[in-house]
């Protein structure tokens, strides 16, 4: 059997214990139309307490199924006795003040326990029963003296101001310690509605649809307990988060104080303390990668700056102190060497021509033979010298012809070399660079192409390039993130 209870909150989160104790125990006599409605759901008396009136109203709405299936806080009573009683076609149980007034219009106070600190009288209550709008609602007065919303949720029995002096004195001993504990807790935040009036709210309507709601422990008697979370399971599933009546949580802050020594008797469980594990990563001062902590780079790999004698790690091309470019960091351009080669060849050829080499002249050899014969024959020195001079004079036109012929052959050779150089320029230039060793290890050839996007750089071996990729290092040349490493083969 599904147990239904009438509550004070919008979603069944707070019971009628928030009502003043004097009003809960006040005997009221329903008017004939309301009495007829109550007796239709099992009421047998003529006078009831406020708890019983709320309970039977909830039973009536449950029995007649006047609530909306989707939005269960809306009650439709246009063609029902409840609509004639309240004078409205529909209402929401969240309209506190409106429903409070409609209920009290149909009640007459029979007996009332008047507490010593109560400022209301019987005539004042009768004005509320008559529906006077100029008077302030008694529960609205309670709202002005509520300590805080967090105290209302944690201690609903202390929210009423209609207590006897003896009851307030009994609870006054408990308040300082509990308030002190609340004061030491850090930034207690409570989300609640503006007013918590004595309203009738249906709780656990959905328990008719599933038998799982029996485990919530709803009491079968009409007395409403002060439990908050036991009866709101089904309503929390149906309503949105914004419809929940009260949610309390704590936010830790640096200014929160520790618990005082007077609270030694109030031991806190492990659930009260929450430990968060935070890992803090300290970033470097610069965006550049540090090679000082790399175990695979030894001091032998460092290079010395020629300007300031500073020892620098192998990868950065510039000195860390004077920002001078490292020597031999980039290979020399082939175009410059090719442009200089013809000039050097011309100079060498001109020197060769002047020295007399590569001149195919048979007379020059005869002159040398005659000189050797002159050294052997001492008698004919003068005659041999004159003959040698004459032979040199006769050989001048032949040597000039040979020089012209050799210069034409040199020009043809230079043209052939230039055509070969042009063909080499058309071919890719990286095979020549790949012959050089790896920039990092200086031992293996450059066969690991560092690819990033549609471009790549060939400046390291495959092993060193894979290490850079594995350590999430950027490209040493352009500082772009490395996408992949390609092992490069050359013919």
Swiss-Prot record:
Zn(2+) binds at residues 305, 308, 319, 322. Residues 383-406 have a biased composition (Polar residues). Its EC number is 2.3.2.27. Residues 26-109 form the SWIB/MDM2 domain. A motif (Nucleolar localization signal) lies at residues 466-473. Gene3D superfamilies: SWIB/MDM2 domain, Zinc/RING finger domain, C3HC4 (zinc finger), Zn-finger domain of Sec23/24. A zinc finger (RanBP2-type) spans 299-328. Its main location: nucleus. Residues 125-148, 164-179, 332-347, 360-374, 407-418 have a biased composition (Basic and acidic residues). Residues 223-232 are annotated as: Interaction with USP7. One of its GO terms (molecular function) is ubiquitin protein ligase activity. A motif (Nuclear localization signal) lies at residues 179-185. Keywords: Apoptosis, Cytoplasm, Metal-binding, Nucleus, Phosphoprotein, Transferase, Ubl conjugation, Ubl conjugation pathway, Zinc, Zinc-finger. Residues 1-101 are annotated as: Sufficient to promote the mitochondrial pathway of apoptosis. A motif (Nuclear export signal) lies at residues 190-202. PROSITE patterns: SWIB_MDM2, ZF_RANBP2_1, ZF_RANBP2_2, ZF_RING_2. Residues 210-304 are annotated as: ARF-binding. One of its GO terms (biological process) is apoptotic process. Residues 1-25, 114-188, 211-237, 252-272, 332-418 are annotated as: Disordered. E3 ubiquitin-protein ligase that mediates ubiquitination of p53/TP53, leading to its degradation by the proteasome. Inhibits p53/TP53- and p73/TP73-mediated cell cycle arrest and apoptosis by binding its transcriptional activation domain. Also acts as a ubiquitin ligase E3 toward itself and ARRB1. Permits the nuclear export of p53/TP53. Promotes proteasome-dependent ubiquitin-independent degradation of retinoblastoma RB1 protein. Inhibits DAXX-mediated apoptosis by inducing its ubiquitination and degradation. Component of the TRIM28/KAP1-MDM2-p53/TP53 complex involved in stabilizing p53/TP53. Belongs to the MDM2/MDM4 family. Region I is sufficient for binding p53 and inhibiting its G1 arrest and apoptosis functions. It also binds p73 and E2F1. Region II contains most of a central acidic region required for interaction with ribosomal protein L5 and a putative C4-type zinc finger. The RING finger domain which coordinates two molecules of zinc interacts specifically with RNA whether or not zinc is present and mediates the heterooligomerization with MDM4. It is also essential for its ubiquitin ligase E3 activity toward p53 and itself. This is E3 ubiquitin-protein ligase Mdm2. The gene is MDM2.
């Amino acid at each position: 059997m599904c147990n239904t209870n009438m509550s004070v909150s919008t979603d069944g989160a707070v019971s009628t214990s928030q009502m003043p104790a004097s009003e809960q125990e006040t005997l009221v006599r329903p008017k004939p139309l309301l009495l007829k409605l109550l007796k239709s759901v099992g009421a047998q008396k003529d006078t009831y307490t406020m708890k019983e009136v709320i309970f039977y109203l909830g039973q009536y709405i449950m029995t007649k199924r006047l609530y909306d299936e989707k939005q269960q806080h809306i009650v439709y009573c246009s063609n029902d006795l409840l609509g004639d009683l309240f004078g409205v076609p529909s209402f929401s149980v969240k309209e506190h003040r409106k429903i409070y007034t409609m209920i009290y219009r149909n009640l007459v106070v029979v007996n009332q326990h008047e507490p010593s600190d109560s400022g209301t009288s019987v005539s004042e209550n009768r004005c509320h029963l008559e529906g006077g709008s100029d008077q302030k609602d008694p529960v609205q007065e309670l709202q002005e003296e509520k300590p805080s919303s967090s105290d209302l949720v944690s201690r609903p029995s202390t929210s009423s101001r209609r207590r006897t002096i003896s009851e307030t004195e009994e609870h006054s001993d408990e308040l300082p310690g509990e308030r002190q504990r609340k004061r030491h807790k850090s930034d207690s935040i409570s989300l609640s509605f503006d007013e918590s009036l004595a309203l009738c709210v249906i709780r656990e309507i959905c328990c008719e649809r599933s038998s799982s709601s029996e485990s919530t422990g709803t009491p079968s008697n009409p007395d409403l307990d002060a439990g908050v979370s036991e009866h709101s399971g089904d309503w929390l599933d149906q309503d949105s988060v914004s419809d929940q009546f009260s949610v309390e949580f704590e936010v830790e802050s640096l200014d929160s104080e520790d618990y005082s020594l007077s609270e030694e008797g109030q031991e806190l469980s492990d659930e009260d303390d929450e430990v968060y594990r935070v890992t803090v990563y300290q970033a470097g001062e610069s965006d550049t990668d540090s090679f000082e902590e790399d175990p695979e780079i030894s001091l032998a790999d460092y290079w010395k700056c020629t300007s300031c004698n500073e020892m620098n790690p192998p990868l950065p091309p510039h000195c860390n102190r004077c920002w001078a470019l490292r020597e031999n960091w980039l290979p020399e351009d082939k175009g410059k060497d090719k442009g200089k080669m013809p000039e050097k060849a011309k100079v060498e050829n001109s020197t060769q021509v002047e020295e007399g080499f590569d001149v195919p002249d048979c007379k020059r050899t005869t002159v040398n033979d005659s000189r050797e014969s002159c050294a052997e024959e001492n008698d004919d020195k003068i005659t041999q010298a004159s003959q040698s001079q004459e032979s040199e004079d006769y050989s001048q036109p032949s040597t000039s012809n040979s020089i012209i012929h050799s210069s034409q052959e040199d020009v043809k050779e230079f043209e052939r070399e230039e055509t070969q150089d042009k063909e080499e320029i058309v071919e890719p230039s990286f095979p020549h660079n790949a012959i050089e060793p790896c920039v990092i290890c200086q031992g293996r050839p450059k066969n690991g192409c560092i690819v990033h996007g549609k471009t790549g750089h060939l400046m390291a071996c495959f092993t060193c390039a894979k290490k850079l990729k594995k350590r999430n290092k950027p490209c040493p040349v352009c500082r772009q993130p490395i996408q992949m490493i390609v092992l490069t083969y050359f013919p």
